[in-house]
Amino acid sequence: MFYIVPREPQQRWGLEQRWLLPMALSPKDFDEPLLAPDTAVRHYVVACHREKAQLRGTQTLNYIEHWERQVLNPRGLARPVIGVHNLPRVRKTRRDPWYNLVDDLTRRGTAPVLLPRRIYQRYRVVWNQAGWVAGENFIEVLPQPQVPLEPLLAVLNAGVSEMALRVSAHVYGGGVYNLSPGSVGEVPVVDVRQLSAERQDQLTSAYRGFLQSKGKDRGALDTVVLDVLGLPPTFAASLESALGRMQHLSDAVLEPIAVDPNEGNTWLEELCLL
């Protein structure tokens, strides 16, 4: 795939960092629910708007010309195509130069909150602090103005939110919980703007503890969120039991690399893997 470059090929080619953007391709790409400036990058997006004449002497030009010579067999065509630039979907965009995704990526922007598109055993909402480009395995969330981000992330990572999202998802065979942007918008979430400053501070503190555990311990976070909702401490055990049964449905499921690119898709076609 020309536009998405894993770290190993990037290093092998020696592709210049100034024409690459870090990409969150899959929840399996990182071990904690935070994309910080120092998070290790496993995939990049080629983001170069320079003409080939301006790229002389660079590894990026060698990479581009390599892909212009490749024989490809796109689905739906009877004959092979020589070069990524001659693929019908690439020619249809009329980008100048053909590999320039910079304008589209700039218009699209990035979101600070990444929901998993499909939920398996593990559920984590990612804070996209570093502003990575998100792939099709995520639903990007742009909070409303004036919504404090860390309290919101605390609520979204809590067990009650996991339950609400799993309930609203379509369940596929094998226990795969598939979320769509439309259904996510209808899931009830605590309006953290309406909480007192003290409550917001409690949520922020609990969320930072959750991050320190690399997303492995949300006990304190759940306690604060249940208290905010006015639910008794005994509710936590019932919640964990119900979530355990839901997660058990996914025990035998292997997480795929990609999802259906036609379902609620807002990604650039070149960044879809199917």
Role assignments for model-derived ranges:
Residues Q59, D191-L274:
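Non-catalytic DNA-recognition/assembly elements of restriction-modification systems
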